[in-house]
Amino acid sequence: MTERTLILIKPDGVTNGHVGEIIARIERKGLKLAALDLRVADRETAEKHYEEHADKPFFGELVEFITSAPLIAGIVEGERAIDAWRQLAGGTDPVSKATPGTIRGDFALTVGENVVHGSDSPESAEREISIWFPNL
């Protein structure tokens, strides 16, 4: 089934020079880039994106990090795009859950700065795409 998902290459992925390799991995997997935008996220967008974590102690730190430097927001589409992207990304904890060969397993060291984000369901993808790309 063809799906669309939001991807973010977070500020650590951009500032550490991993954008080209991450995009290459997406394309090698057979996924298509439907939209790609380099931007500095504003606080309102970041807070909407992470609203499910608003009552958690790390919320402020998460918003500060995601708005701290440029990031890449993108839409990836293809057959089972959500699962395919999550497989490429690896587990959210890059040391204990992300295996080598995944983006997080290869490029990240902490849960807070784990290089990429991807929607975890079709519903999340629809919501997140509308936040980051309201005109699409």
Curated annotation (Swiss-Prot):
Cofactor(s) in the UniProt record: Mg(2+)
GO cellular component: cytoplasm
Keyword Ribosomal protein: no
InterPro entries the UniProt entry points to: NDK-like_dom (IPR034907), NDK-like_dom_sf (IPR036850), Nucleoside_diP_kinase (IPR001564), Nucleoside_diP_kinase_AS (IPR023005)
Keywords, ordered alphabetically: ATP-binding, Cytoplasm, Kinase, Magnesium, Metal-binding, Nucleotide metabolism, Nucleotide-binding, Phosphoprotein, Transferase
GO MF, one example: ATP binding
Residues at which ATP binds: K10, F58, R86, T92, R104, N114
SMART domains: NDK (SM00562)
Domain of life: Bacteria
EC number: 2.7.4.6
Compartments reported by the entry: Cytoplasm
Any Pfam family: NDK
Catalysed conversion reaction: a 2'-deoxyribonucleoside 5'-diphosphate + ATP = a 2'-deoxyribonucleoside 5'-triphosphate + ADP; a ribonucleoside 5'-diphosphate + ATP = a ribonucleoside 5'-triphosphate + ADP
Keyword field contains Transferase: yes
SUPFAM superfamilies in alphabetical order: Nucleoside diphosphate kinase, NDK (SSF54919)
UniProt record, GO biological process: CTP biosynthetic process; GTP biosynthetic process; UTP biosynthetic process
Active site residues of this protein: H117 (pros-phosphohistidine intermediate)
CDD domains linked to this entry: NDPk_I (cd04413)
Family that this chain belongs to: Belongs to the NDK family.
Described function: Major role in the synthesis of nucleoside triphosphates other than ATP. The ATP gamma phosphate is transferred to the NDP beta phosphate via a ping-pong mechanism, using a phosphorylated active-site intermediate.
Subunit organization: Homotetramer.
HAMAP family the UniProt entry points to: NDP_kinase
Name of the protein in question: Nucleoside diphosphate kinase
Organism expressing this protein natively: Corynebacterium efficiens (strain DSM 44549 / YS-314 / AJ 12310 / JCM 11189 / NBRC 100395)
Gene of this entry: ndk
